[in-house]
From Swiss-Prot:
<dbReference type="GO" id="GO:0004521">
    <property type="term" value="F:RNA endonuclease activity"/>
</dbReference>
<dbReference type="GO" id="GO:0008344">
    <property type="term" value="P:adult locomotory behavior"/>
</dbReference>
<keyword id="KW-0479">Metal-binding</keyword>
<feature type="domain" description="EndoU">
    <location>
        <begin position="53"/>
        <end position="322"/>
    </location>
</feature>
<keyword id="KW-0456">Lyase</keyword>
<keyword id="KW-0812">Transmembrane</keyword>
<keyword id="KW-0472">Membrane</keyword>
<comment type="subunit">
    <text>Monomer.</text>
</comment>
<dbReference type="GO" id="GO:0016829">
    <property type="term" value="F:lyase activity"/>
</dbReference>
<dbReference type="GO" id="GO:0050995">
    <property type="term" value="P:negative regulation of lipid catabolic process"/>
</dbReference>
<keyword id="KW-0694">RNA-binding</keyword>
<keyword id="KW-0378">Hydrolase</keyword>
<dbReference type="GO" id="GO:0046872">
    <property type="term" value="F:metal ion binding"/>
</dbReference>
<feature type="active site">
    <location>
        <position position="200"/>
    </location>
</feature>
<dbReference type="GO" id="GO:0003723">
    <property type="term" value="F:RNA binding"/>
</dbReference>
<feature type="active site">
    <location>
        <position position="259"/>
    </location>
</feature>
<comment type="function">
    <text>Endoribonuclease that cleaves single-stranded RNAs at uridylates and releases products that have 2'-3'-cyclic phosphate termini. Preferentially cleaves single stranded RNA at poly-U sites with CU, UC and AU sites cleaved less efficiently. May target mRNAs encoding proteins involved in lipid metabolism to regulate their expression. Regulates levels of TBPH protein, but not mRNA, by an as yet unknown mechanism. Important for neuronal development or function.</text>
</comment>
């Protein structure tokens, strides 16, 4: 009898253990299911649909600015200081124009801002020096573009370009459009392939001791930190309405070369910068000004094309708020 009782107890213990294991399995499965359903409910109720596709860039720019749900967390302060003129040679701004949250930039490695700034050391400054893009550089280009393509700002822009029959609805076609438009290397003279739309607009170039481009506030801030830019004062600025956001024209020196006037947007995201420049260049008639509205600030985006191997690329594009 004792042997039978022990066997019965052993069987009962095994069944109890199996039951407990099954319960844990069911509970874990239920928790995972609830988590997945909760995420889908969150997405459904909290992700708003994109606004109706506009017919003109002016309306598009208003919609794009509305998608900038928050100001750049990386921009701590804008020090405008003294007003100047393009013909002046004195320094009316002893402090840097921008102060950044460097620690936050270091932590947010996958943000469009961090991915943009990762590209800043991939290029030769002098357009007379041949560019030699490495596989790593090309990968960093695609990492940045894919991140930009994932934003609501660029999704809305691409839908506008599809509406204008400029690009297809296919993701790969849209990615290719941005890659070719912004990152195709071309020559600005002497047959030396030492430039690109991206390098000119989002960074800066030097040709025959003249500063070209530099129409992105993040590159300006980066070069200030490195001691390559010396801000001399502002010529004109229009506030957009959100903290630290404006259309700004400035005077400065870059590598000790004077730049009497230069314009860029301040405090906006890389995707909004790229979206505005892309839409204006592709959807506006050749050499025609492109009128935009970002909050309280109205401006005109000026663009000039560069023909290269049968392609229509960006020679320059920048905002003018005067």
């Amino acid at each position: 009898m004792d042997a039978v009782q022990q066997q019965t107890n052993s069987t009962s213990n095994i069944d109890s253990a199996k039951c407990q294991k099954l319960k844990r399995f069911v509970i874990v499965g239920l928790l995972i299911t609830i988590g997945i359903l909760s995420w889908h409910f969150y997405e459904y109720f909290h992700s708003k649909p994109l606004p109706k596709t506009p017919d003109d860039v002016l309306t598009l720019s208003k919609n794009l600015y509305a998608e900038e749900t928050e100001v750049s967390p990386y921009l701590y302060k804008v020090n405008l200081q003294g007003k100047t003129t393009s013909g002046a040679h004195d320094d009316r701004a002893p402090r840097n124009l921008f102060e950044l949250h460097q620690d936050l930039l270091a932590r947010d490695a996958n943000s469009t801002t961090a991915l943009l700034m990762r590209l800043f050391d991939n290029y030769e400054l002098d357009v007379a020096v041949q560019e030699h893009p490495t596989p790593e550089h090309v990968q960093e280009q695609y990492d940045f573009l894919r991140a930009v393509m994932g934003t609501r700002v660029m999704k809305l822009t691409m839908r506008f370009l599809v509406h204008k029959d400029i690009v297809s609805v296919e993701y790969d076609d849209q990615l290719r459009l941005l890659q070719e438009l912004w990152f195709t290397p071309y020559s600005r003279g002497r047959g030396i392939v030492g430039s690109s739309s991206f390098e000119h607009v989002f960074m800066a170039e030097i040709r025959d001791q003249k500063v070209l481009g530099l129409h992105n506030w993040l590159y300006f801030a980066d070069q200030e930190q490195r001691g390559n830019v010396d801000y001399k004062g502002w010529l004109n600025h229009k506030e957009m309405g959100k903290h630290n956001q404006m259309v700004l024209s400035v005077r400065y020196t870059f590598h000790n070369i004077n730049k009497p006037v230069n314009g860029f947007f301040v405090g906006i995201s890389p995707e909004l910068d790229m979206a505005l420049y892309t839409a204006c260049f592709l959807a506006t008639a050749k050499e025609e000004p492109c009128h935009i509205q970002l909050g309280h600030a109205s401006a005109t985006i000026v663009s000039h094309e560069w023909k290269w191997n049968g392609m229509r690329l960006i020679g320059t594009v920048y905002p003018d708020s005067s």
